[in-house]
A protein has these predicted regions:
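Hydrophobic, proline/glycine-rich low-complexity stretches
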Residues: 36-45, 50-53, 245-252
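Charged surface patches that recognize polyanionic ligands
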Residues: 40-49, 56-178
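Short, charge-rich patches within N-terminal targeting peptides
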Residues: 27-30
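Acidic, contiguous internal or C-terminal segments within carbohydrate-active enzymes
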Residues: 53, 175-204
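Mixed-charge, glycine-accented linear interaction segment located at domain edges/termini
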Residues: 190-246
Length: 253
């Protein structure tokens, strides 16, 4: 297999973790010119542990499902994430997030199954992530070998405990334990999909209880049409992309 190409602005050194210090002087100069300039204060951001569950479904998001999710206050976001698929790095999820940072997630295992009786069942996944800022040097030139762009339009609600009860709040910055819930419209290689995901953050000992309490609240009202998310549809974005490559083009999506 030939050398892996990377999205604009991401050099081989950034993608593979190699150092330019041990390279010949001429090669160092070439690589330094290729790398986008970053402010001196740029640092790696460690997001800590998360506990997540996600379901991904084929087809367009139905208005009835959007209405079901609309019971809670939500923010919206549209962006394109680009995932590294080849080489496949087991236990790692690598993506360029919205063109502004490289995000690396390490899989820490599954503590079991989330089950909301009669409403939903999915595989819980524990992750730890790091973010590396970078700036693309020029406009995107389309899909690069080994990478898969995914267009997303997300509705995001956040839930936290208050007076021993789980309550929804308007999305925003904060350090308190919480669980984010996102309903996402997906466009990849000319195909429409949608996803429902939960992500708990905060102290490790509270992650599962936060996620379970949030899921119980969200699924207190069943999904429209008797839909019941199950383990067959439960997986991370990276795993799903490797298993369902899709066909066609995103042109005009």
């Amino acid at each position: 297999m030939g050398p892996v190409q990377h999205p604009a602005g991401l050099t081989e050194a950034q993608a593979c973790g190699s150092s330019v210090r041990n390279r010949p002087a001429g090669q160092q100069g070439q690589e330094q010119k290729a790398m986008p300039a970053e402010p001196p204060h740029s640092t790696v951001t460690e997001g800590g542990r998360t506990l997540e569950v996600r379901w991904i479904f084929p087809g367009r998001l139905e208005p009835a499902v959007a209405g079901w999710f609309g019971r809670f206050p939500a923010g919206t976001e549209s962006r394109e994430d680009t995932y590294l698929l080849d080489p496949r790095l087991r236990g790692l999820s690598v993506k360029v997030r919205g063109g502004g940072e490289l995000e690396v997630k390490v899989y820490r295992g599954s503590p079991g199954i989330l089950e909301v009786a009669g409403r939903a069942r999915g595989r819980l996944e524990s992750w730890q992530k790091w973010s590396f800022p970078f700036s693309p040097p020029g406009p995107d030139r389309g899909e690069r070998a080994g990478w898969r762009p995914v267009r997303k339009r997300r509705r995001i609600s956040r839930f936290s405990r208050a007076s021993s009860q789980i309550v929804a709040r308007v999305p925003g910055p904060g350090q308190q334990p919480e669980c984010g819930v996102e309903l996402t419209e997906i466009r990849v290689r000319g195909q429409d999909w949608w996803s429902l995901g939960f992500e708990a953050t905060g102290p490790a000992g509270l992650l599962r209880s936060e996620l379970q309490a949030t899921a119980a609240l969200v699924f207190a009202q069943a999904l429209p049409g008797g839909m019941e998310p199950g383990t067959d549809d439960s997986r991370s974005f990276a795993e799903w992309l490797c298993q369902r490559p899709g066909t066609g083009s995103d042109t005009g999506a």
